Design a protein with these regions (language model features):
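Core catalytic alpha/beta fold that binds nucleotide/phospho-ligands
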Residues: 1-160
Length: 160
């Protein structure tokens, strides 16, 4: 399982800007280029992929098992949203990321409103203290190889 963290050092990622960079990523690392369902979920013929972005970070996970990923810059969340979604009051960003990663795993937005997610496996990736990254799967999550790149796909850091 490989997690590519792509950092745009000059600005924030825009919606849909990920498709172009993922195609470049696939060419650079000899990976399959995803197709996209009508819902926007990326799919592969061989294996699984999930994508998320927040501000200057784009995260892409390639896996041989079903996987979902979410990343969020750690920031305050409005109390009204915490109450509406019944997010964990101590760590609402982590709770949000767990729900979003399950949404991406299952391609089902109803999981944003679900509090109990005990049937899934979660892995939190510690990469940057200002960024929350959560993986979700319906199977135990194996070791993750982290590859940190800049927006030109040059290596910044490789961690195993």
């Amino acid at each position: 399982m490989k997690l590519y963290i792509i950092q745009n050092l000059n600005s924030h990622w825009k919606n849909n800007s990920s498709k172009n960079i993922i195609t470049k990523l696939a060419h650079k690392f000899n990976l399959e280029i995803p197709q996209y369902k009508e819902t926007g979920k990326p799919i592969l013929n061989t294996g699984y992929i999930s994508i998320s972005h927040s501000n200057q970070f784009l995260v892409v996970i390639y896996s041989n098992q079903p996987i979902g990923i979410d990343c969020e810059i750690i920031r305050p969340i409005q109390q009204s949203l915490i109450d509406k979604l019944k997010l964990d009051k101590l760590n609402p960003i982590l709770d949000w990321c767990k729900r979003e990663s399950v949404i991406k795993l299952l391609d089902d937005k109803s999981y944003l409103l679900k509090k109990e997610l005990n049937e899934y496996y979660f892995e939190t990736v510690s990469f940057n203290p200002l960024l929350c990254i959560v993986l979700a799967s319906n199977k135990a999550i194996p070791t993750i190889e982290i590859i940190h790149l800049d927006s030109e796909l040059n290596f910044i850091n490789l961690t195993q």
